[in-house]
């Protein structure tokens, strides 16, 4: 099922056939460099894909969605919305991950802008956060390009990350 489309991308629910390209993405150390748990095995990827397929039990409207090229259907990565507790406050994180062969094309920014619009217009969310690991300059640039600003730091079992945030109330989202 399609969640949203942008000029170049389709974000859709994951399908079982996405396992192979998702595993290719997850086993790449460059792509997973800023993930505290590093690369993933095939079994770990399969388990995560099952979570994507079943959705979040408490927030089924949220999730990470397969991000594919609109014209070819080529799997490019994943982008979406995840529930988090930050400092005891429930938040929704905008998360994105694109195949390194397509880095530098603005695809993560385009996907993130589409998800921001979906969060504001369809889900009626009032605010989003983005959790950026220290040193991840590319992810930081995407967060800033979609209008997020540094709000502080968050520490949990995964480590310390920078929290970028953006209100969705009364704000337009740039088109790509």
Report residues per predicted region.
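GNAT-family acyltransferases
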Residues: 1-101, 114-118, 122, 131-133, ...
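Conserved acetyl-CoA-binding loop-helix of GNAT-fold acetyltransferases
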Residues: 104-118, 137-145
């Amino acid at each position: 099922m399609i969640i949203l489309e942008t000029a170049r991308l389709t974000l859709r629910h994951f399908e079982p056939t996405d396992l192979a390209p998702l595993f290719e993405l997850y086993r790449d150390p460059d792509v997973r460099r800023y993930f505290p748990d590093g690369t993933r095995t095939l079994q770990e990827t399969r388990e995560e894909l099952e979570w994507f397929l079943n959705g979040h039990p408490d927030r089924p409207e949220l999730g990470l969605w397969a991000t594919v090229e609109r014209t070819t259907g080529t799997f490019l990565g994943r982008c979406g919305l995840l529930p988090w507790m930050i400092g005891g406050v429930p938040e929704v994180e905008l998360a994105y991950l694109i195949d390194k062969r397509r880095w530098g094309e603005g695809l993560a920014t385009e996907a993130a802008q589409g998800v921001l619009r979906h969060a504001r217009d369809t889900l009626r969310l009032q605010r989003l956060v983005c959790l950026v690991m220290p040193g991840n300059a590319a992810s930081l640039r995407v967060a800033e390009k979609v209008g997020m600003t540094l709000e502080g730091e968050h520490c949990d079992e995964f480590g310390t990350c920078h929290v970028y945030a953006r209100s969705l109330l009364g704000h337009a989202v740039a088109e790509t």
